[in-house]
Amino acid sequence: MRRWFSKLGSTSLASTSRVTAFSSSESAAVEQLADSSIPPPITPFIIAKPDIHWNVDFASDPCSWESCFDAHWEAAEKLLENEEEISYEKVITVFQHLNCTVQLLMMEANAQPESAIGSILDRHFTHQIMERVVDWAIAAPHFLTPTCQVNMIGLYEVIVGESHTQNHCLLVHKPMLLPLLKLLDWCRKSAEKRNFTPSNTDRHFVLLLNQICTKLAEDTTLLHFFFDFDDDCDEQFLVFSLLIPYLYDSGEVGQLARDALLLILSVSRRLKRVATFIAVKSNFCPVVATGLSGCFSQLSRSFGSMLYVSDSWHKINADDIDSYSSLLDFHSSLIFCNAVIQVAHGYVVSQVIRYVYHGFLLPVVLPSLLQGGQDELISSTAYYHLCLDSVTETVLVQTIVKLLLNESCESNKTVLDVIVERISAGNRLSQVSLSLVRTLIDLRCEDIMFDLVFKYLLPCTFLQPNQTLHLKNQMYVRTAAQTLLTFVPECTYKSSALCSQETLHIYLSECRNYVQETTDACCEKWVWSYDGRSPFFMPKINSDEESATNSNGAFVRHSSVRSSMASARNGLNRYFVSRNAHITADSLRQHTPPPELGEQESSSRSSFPYDIADSSLVLDDEGDELIIPALTPTSLMMMTSSSDYFQFAYGELSETDTEAINPSVVSMSGAPAQSISDKASLASTSANCDTDIEMARSFVLRGWGQIEDTDTFMALMDRVPASKIKHSLEENMALIDSRIQYLEELKAEAKLQDLESDGFKSDTNNDNDDEDPAPLGKPIECFGNQGVGPFLESIMRSLENMLDNSLYVTLQTTSVLAALASYPQPLIAHYLFDQRMLLQPNVKNLFKVMDSLKTQIDAYASSLDGFDVLLERGIKFLRSRAERYEKVVESSRRLRSSESFSRNGNMEGRSSSRGLFNRFRSSNNKRLYPSNDSSHPHEFRIYTHKAIESRDVTLDHARAKQFVFAAIILSQFCQELAATVLQHSTVVPRPKVSPAKDYLRREVNSAGKDANCCAD
């Protein structure tokens, strides 16, 4: 913690006593100062503290201002010109007079309606007051440096802070600006000499810089005076550079520095030159990442030893942050980093993201998540969870999540896989890991859900043969809801607090909102619908032997956090995937849009656009011909690595279209004839195709790269037959959107490349310049014969062990399952709820697990005397915990709302109101039980009048509590799942209207109005 003292600086006791003694002699008047001689050094003369006699007459008489100014400046000038040794008392006297002159100057400046040079300001310029004072202060003895700096800074604080005229800042004048820059440089050199150890000048210095930055944000024209647009200048932006060392200071100094830096960053968003300086020439970006690492290293490796955590603790909350200073500093640094991403220029953002990932997440956070004992892993997971909870900007969330998806440990598993493995432990580590996974699921990110769930469900190997036909409808909804309600334990029927129409209606309302949010997010941002047809599952072909022995190969897609979280102009267009995809007939023809994701491809809608034997494709002048060669093993590998695009290229190919395809390959003129081995390869490829459709899919249009002149290209395009297919307005609108998004991506990438090329030329010391801040993804292989994957298996296993797990692990497990149930994708929805689908014997069925739990709970309840009493006490206990949990959540909300940086509204899914204990809160938000009840509200005792008589029950009270809690949770969980599955059939996606569609609709409406006017 930096310390600062009074505005006059720290003084010794002796000097203070001298000031007191001299100040007591007030017989000398200001008028006598001109006639008085400079006292000898032994008995220095100190005048009384000068003051301005404020009254109505003085305030309304500018002439009196000038005379008062002249008197004070004359007194100060005599002391400045005195060649005697500068003492502390002399310094104080000089600055007392100067403070009066500055106040008079600001009175004059604020009294003028327009920017003009008044008489007092003219006197400042004529006498070069500020420059002379700065030079005099710099020449003072070293022990007086802090005092001189604090007082000089105080003068400029008045000049900058009390300037109330928006169009007239006195800093635009060189007699004011140049001494200020000299003062700032002097303060910086002093701080460097003491290695930036805390000093009493820090607060005043940073406050002045903050005031200057505020003026720069209000009037960007001032940048011409503080920012040197000459790239060869050493001190291009002194004010910004001076703030960086104070970025992570504790207390008010650090907060003032961070606020000032954010103001400059917001200005740089509109000025490319300033942004380039910040990103390349300054050390701001690495300092941001280094500060995060430093704050993280100060955190305790064992959170339990740092703070008391209860059994229900699973993540860091607002109370935890307020209770520990190092945790508060780390949280503040995360909030600042998020604010930087929010307000800064795109080039600065890319640099900050690069340094945060390579300078903080990789070297600091990643090892902590994978190494250490259980306490260390619990703390590291909670800290990582805090990072995810604290940030809201999409690109920063992507970067944090990327650590889980892209980085691997020694066993070649991703970090996310390692966290999933910890779920089934049933201890505090699994509780914290489950909480993190729940937050990840609430992000509604396609790449996260693909890694957790869908890459294991896509091959459909968890189903018995011929079961995928059930994925086409939602006929299971009503039956599933009714069945889920039958799993409510019968021992809870008598409790109106657990089972009633009112409770079910509350769940229906809450689940509708939650399912609607999930559906909208998936519809707006996700690429695939995961309905068994989109994306098209295709085996990975490496060789004939592998294809013969491994029927369920690897499904490979390009995974990218950007694909589901980063939004374009109106969110990611689901028709446009990547401009790096293979060139297809549709993409060249640009007439037929791709099929709607999840639609059944109609064979009558399209036809294969090219006939290889068509003579119209032969160029008459050179005899060259555009060929469609057979798919080679190399191109097969390319296809399997981008099978998403392969589906788009041939998804609409009908069986009748394949009859027109001639698989013969014609050699191009001037090229060697195709060898027999190539023909054999073609025959081998054809032999591996079971149907004509697969044979047609084994061709891809190539040859455009050999066309080098425009005339040949245009002649070839003229020979392309026009499409006879007509599309609806909605299809054309979607295609227009994809083209617009494509052009915008090209423009954005070109602009970013220009910025990077300009910046990196001058940044020769950066070793990571050739790396992207967040790579777009890596190939992810999806293998069959793995059931439903380790995540779903762990969750099902944890649910199955409900009667053995702790209360809070059970709450986390059911919370994660409820979040998964809100996803509308058919693969996950049918797996969880469709009883018609026959699963493989080794795959756990949700309904069977819940039926088994109900049976065990009812059997135990019927064998235990007084179970109804225990049930009521269990409800009371959970209600009290729910109220405490709501208070914690409300405290966290207040903390977020009190932050000085605005939150991103696109992350609504992360702040879901469906908390762990929300199932047990009262419907009218009041306690169901009076506070003066005989039992403590935070204890759950099973001793009743019957329990006292039965020693068997008292010896097994822990087991009884386990079953009581399980009965309560299962009753609520069944109703919640039933409400969720019912909403799957009623919720309709609400995608955003794209600007292109909105523009065309306005054009159509205006045309219709014009037609009506003409008709009238």
Swiss-Prot record:
Cleaved signal peptide residues: none
Protein name: FHIP family protein Bm1_18400
Chain segments carrying region Disordered: 586-608, 757-778
Taxonomy, superkingdom: Eukaryota
Species: Brugia malayi
InterPro entries recorded: FHIP, FHIP_C, FHIP_KELAA_motif
Family membership noted in the UniProt record: Belongs to the FHIP family.
